[in-house]
Amino acid sequence: MNRVFLFGKLSFTPNRLQTKNGTLGATFSMECLDSSGFNNAKSFIRVTAWGKVASFIVAQNPGVMLFVEGRLTTYKITNSENKNTYALQVTADKIFHPDEKTTNEEPIKSTVVDSPFMNPKASVTEAEFEQAFPHQDETDFNNITPIFENDVQLEEESDD
């Protein structure tokens, strides 16, 4: 199972992306505090969103508190020497303000409080599984035109 839940602040204005077929995307960074209780370290986590989720996040201002539900994905970076490296990011499926009753798409149906992990069942129907873990088509990253005007800012913040 690949599910990620983040709670934190939007660290900078999201970067807009657009695929060749016109799908809106956005990359941004979430400032999250370590909740283990051992230290107060901050992590700056790279997040990507697509479609309605991206439309929601590009309208947000830095510093706003957000709850992100998504999954870990990898992406490839080719440097100037034509060498490939890979990195992890979170791909957001849902984003909402913790104090509001609606998400970027619809009324909240699965929050941490009523998630399938809190009330486990011996078996679930296919419809229940699909609602808890919606399937999304894989994105063809070769057809994306990135606009990374804030990536330097992301690198500077993550060096803390």
From Swiss-Prot:
Q: A single GO molecular function, which one? A: enzyme activator activity
Q: Which InterPro entries match?
A: NA-bd_OB-fold (IPR012340), Primosome_PriB/ssb (IPR000424), ssDNA-bd (IPR011344)
Cite the entry's keywords alphabetically: DNA-binding
Bilayer-spanning residue ranges: none
CDD domains listed in its UniProt record: SSB_OBF
Gene Ontology annotations of biological process type: DNA replication
DNA-binding: present as a keyword of the record? yes
**Quaternary structure per UniProt?**
Homotetramer.
This one is known as: Single-stranded DNA-binding protein
Q: Which organism is it from?
A: Mycoplasma genitalium (strain ATCC 33530 / DSM 19775 / NCTC 10195 / G37) (Mycoplasmoides genitalium)
